[in-house]
Amino acid sequence: MKKRLAMVLAVTLLATTVFVGCGSKDNSSDKNSKKEYTEKKSGDKFTVGFDQDFPPMGFVGDDGEYTGFDLELAQEVCKRQGWKYVAKPIAWDSKDAELKSGGIDCIWNGFTMDGREDKYTWSKPYLNNEQVFVVRKDSGIKSEKDLEGKVVDVQTDSSAQAALKEKADLSSTFGNLEVVADYNTGLMNLESGSADAVAMDTVVAAYQIEKRKADFTILDYEIAAEEYGVGFAKGNKAVRDQVESTLEEMAKDGTMAKISQKWFKKDITIIGK
């Protein structure tokens, strides 16, 4: 009798434990899936995630400070909102983890929207861009067809890499599609002759060619057309709306055009146009 009672009690205790454990797990899951985002207030910190090897959008200046077109836009937004601006360099292939953990508030660094529309909560696009090939002027490479059997460098986890994956009929003709850590490495490889071409953003390519005074040229071929936007964690419409409205204000009063003139010698922004 005592053995039977002990068995009944043991089974009852086990069932209760399993039930409670499952219930706790479900509640935790529900709690995590219902993350709420709120507007930032004056004095709050606003952390911008960026690739520090991506001039002119975001990079380390000669004075050792972080600078660039996108970072200047972010600074102006923070100034108008009364936020504390923080620029945080990140590994580009870790950007999603940084955003998900709350280590950064947004990704703002020549961030391509195309193909990622459902992955983030986006601002309106503020720049048009193309993915292109950069080659040496004396290479004899005149079109994308001349890249057959050649070494083409591309940054890891970049829009150019994704675009070339979509154009397998072209990339399959390359001798080697070499993935590098950043565009600076690719351009140095191009300069040394260890790479024949670099697939990259035309906005960045034009700036780099002028800055380096390099004998490079951009092929008249568009790998992909795209738009740049500011990417926030999925569902973070509150802060997105604050940033977006400030960018629209900056476009209206000419501040955005002024910053564009500084970096590109012309206004290439598209907000409010």
Task: Describe the residue ranges of each PLM region.
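Extended ligand-binding regions for polar small-molecule ligands
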Residues: G23, L71-R80, K150-V151, T156-S159, ...
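Ligand-binding clefts/hinges and TM-proximal coupling segments of bilobed small-molecule sensing domains
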Residues: S24-T38, S42, K84, S159-E178, ...
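Immediate post-signal peptide segment of exported/extracytoplasmic ligand-binding proteins
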Residues: D26-Y66, K79, G140-V151, K273
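Bilobed "Venus flytrap"/periplasmic-binding protein-like clamshell domains
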Residues: Q52-P55, Y66-K79, F111, V132-L187, ...
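A ligand-binding cleft/hinge motif common to bilobed small-molecule-binding domains
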Residues: S94, G110-K119, A163-A168, E191-A225
